[in-house]
Design a protein with these regions (language model features):
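Short linear motifs centered on Gly/Pro in flexible linkers and helix caps
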Residues: 2, 26, 62, 73-74
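C-terminal structural segments of small proteins and small subunits
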Residues: 64-84
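Conserved short "hinge" loops at termini or chain/domain junctions
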Residues: 1-55, 85-99
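Short, hydrophobic/amphipathic alpha-helical patches that form generic packing surfaces
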Residues: 54-66
């Protein structure tokens, strides 16, 4: 399922296909991806990484409801856990590359 379809489902907008809503959701998805990538310090796979996907959908939900300023404080623990997982994965990649 595409991210836009997931966002529609999370927001209970499954049947909504008007151009304005779709454009807004795509913009929120793009902003969320950029924001989370910046926080985690690496590009995330929002399609297959369940943690990254869940964080992105939460960001979209908060942004859609004009509450994005609450996202970081409400998801601090989840974001921190993702940052640690990304850092560990990057460290392992570096160690494997050095061998």
């Amino acid at each position: 399922m595409a991210l836009i379809d997931d966002a529609r489902s999370v927001l209970h907008l499954d049947g909504v296909t008007d151009e304005g809503t779709v454009t807004r959701l795509n913009m929120l998805i793009d902003h969320g991806q950029a924001y989370l990538t910046g926080l985690c310090g690496a590009k995330l796979d929002y399609e297959s990484d369940r943690e990254a996907h869940a964080l992105l959908m939460a960001y979209v939900r908060y942004a859609y409801n004009d509450a994005v300023e609450m996202f970081l404080s409400n998801f601090h623990d989840d974001i921190f856990r993702k940052q640690l997982n990304v850092a560990i994965a990057l460290r392992e990649e570096e160690a494997n590359a050095d061998q």
